[in-house]
Amino acid sequence: SKDRIQNDIEAFNAFNATPGHGITRLTWTPEYISAYRYVINELKQIGAEVTICRAGCIRGRFPGDDPSSPAVMSGSHIDTVLNGGPFDGVVGTITALEAARVVVENDIPHRHPIDVVVFPEEEGSGFGMVLGGSSLWTGGIDPEEIDRLANVEGLTFDEAMRSAGVTVENDSILRAGDIKAMLEVHIEQSVVLDRENISIGIIESIAGLKWCDLVIEGIANHAGGTPMTYRRDALQGAVRIIAGLCGEICELRQQTARLRGENAIDPDLPVNR
């Protein structure tokens, strides 16, 4: 029902570390755990068999007439970027939950198991690995890869998960043969549907991310006494690189994009860099 969906959205938005400044809910933080437990509780209320799977992924299963057959899966993530929006990930989680409620309430028969799932650390804002939870569950990466990373408190993914009181109950890898179909409902992450007055779209491809850390070294010298012709200003070089990349990428295909996410200047003082 619309009322339940609205209540779910409001509940999720209350689990937020930055009220008034967007939604911040990083993996295994107190806000995240509150949302995590909310999902588990709602699934249990409608009779789901809830299992904490590899990487802390939630799976709420409704067995169906043939419990051994591949599952029809739906869900998303509940972690956010810093100061993010109220719907990213939440929409996919809530729609899967609400669909399961409707199936249960109306006693709709289904042959295949229905799985409502939640993947941790999909945004990568907590531990720096995008699609971390789903990649771990499906065997795309080894646990050692994500455990080389740490959150702002210095905890690895596994340490933070255990500190939050989450215990994996099924550490097996999710295989392609385990899934009949997967559906994730998602918000429009651009303006295309709105501008084109289209109500819904189906994804045909997704951005392939490539992260690069660039270190530009200059020479520090007296800010007032050093002529411009003798300066090697690292920040000025960085600005040229950023502008140059923007120009190059704008000439490529329409779907290509670039983002400069973070800058750090050392020393961050009013001197030549």
Model-identified regions with their sequence ranges:
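Active-site metal-coordination/substrate-binding segment of hydrolases
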Residues: 40-44, 53, 58-154, 158-160, ...
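N-terminal capping segment at the start of a domain
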Residues: 1-29, 120
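Generic non-transmembrane alpha-helical segments
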Residues: 4, 8-11, 15, 38, ...
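Midchain, well-structured core segments that form catalytic/ion-binding scaffolds
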Residues: 121-122, 128-273
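Glycine-rich, flexible beta-strand/loop modules in the N-terminal catalytic cores of phosphate-handling
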Residues: 19-29, 46, 220-226
